[in-house]
């Protein structure tokens, strides 16, 4: 079997190293954290422990941590070696890494990896970018990491294609999760369905919306029926933003994924400034009720089509006269 080095032994990296070892490969792991279970104490030691041509798989956070790791590897590796970035890097970063490494004869392959903490037992879906020759060099490791069967691996194209495919995959994931979440909220809000968890559980078999995400949702709500242990606060990994930005660059309409991303932004606001503006404007033009920051509500007409009392001194454009508090203005829906 082949030998490989893995840089980054977090949840994903450590599990991938274990899966590779179970498949019979020799793995040398390095992480800057002394408590990570690393095999060596430096990148230099990792490189010197591997036979040539070397394959080094990088599993560190995207951005500067990946850039710093690739830069250091560039000074340690030799012509014919291959660097694989299996993190969630942006595809444009891949292209830059490949260009930088090419000057010293080092190859670069990008691998979009999906599977999370379940990948150790179920396998990792792999979306790969690189030349045919470089992908072939790493193929034994791809075969060990991927799920059993014919699917779960794709050579998507040249360098950058793997992470571009993974980026779109994550964008789709945003949309799917948002759809399940909205359906859940509507079922909970109505008094028609008495067992929302059972409804979602029933959808896991035979329906057109069954999926692994649905399985995970049912698992979560069976542990916490109304999700009361959680706050409605959702971070984003960054790939949803990249997906939306790529859609703008290519003039591709992406309403569902964009809305799902923006919903996460909204979840992180304690008090929406935009909604404050809307509340203020509705009160100004229609006298609609508003709620103060202290929680008290001012009286005003807030039902569709209702007339509202105008603030004293409001100018009536039809009569040219200033109206007092007794005057009326059309409600929001009538304007």
Where are these regions (language model features)?
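Rossmann-fold dinucleotide-binding core
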Residues: 4, 69-71, 90-181, 185-187
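Conserved dinucleotide-binding and phosphotransfer motif residues
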Residues: 23, 104, 250
